[in-house]
Design a protein with these regions (language model features):
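Short, polar/acidic, helix-capping and beta-turn segments at strand->helix junctions
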Residues: 2-128
Length: 128
């Protein structure tokens, strides 16, 4: 049976979707954009600032569910410009290393709210 989860500390959804859906021990985290949780606006400062905010947001939401980035099995990274690939990789490595989840990265024409990066995760609960 699935359980829908809505964050109370991370950025609010900008559409009709759950922050995450839990099914058994699997957690499907919706795509996270670099929105400031307090304002809902995309952070300024370029791709590094945006990628950092995405992973901070993910950490906040996972923490609400008793999880960490170590629970991640698969990440999907969406970029509006593949020229940002190296910069995002450097930040990604700081948050996930050295036991990286499986990952895909794709370039897309646009992301919600003018974001340059979005990340979704599939995680595994190790307890309960």
């Amino acid at each position: 049976m699935k359980q829908c989860f809505l964050t109370t500390n991370g950025p609010k959804a900008i559409g009709p979707y759950s922050t995450a859906v839990i099914s058994g021990k699997t957690v499907y985290l919706s795509g996270m954009i670099p929105a400031d949780p307090a304002t809902g606006k995309i952070v300024e400062g370029g791709i590094e600032a945006q990628a950092t905010q995405v992973f901070e947001n993910i950490g906040t939401v996972l923490g609400e569910m008793g999880l960490t980035l170590a629970n991640a099995l698969k990440a999907t990274v969406f970029l509006t410009d593949l020229n940002d690939f190296a910069a995002v990789n450097a930040i990604y490595e700081r948050y996930f290393g050295p036991d990286f989840p499986a990952r895909s990265c794709v370039e897309v024409s646009r992301l919600p709210a003018g974001a340059r990066v979005e990340v979704e995760l599939i995680c595994e609960k190790t307890e309960g």
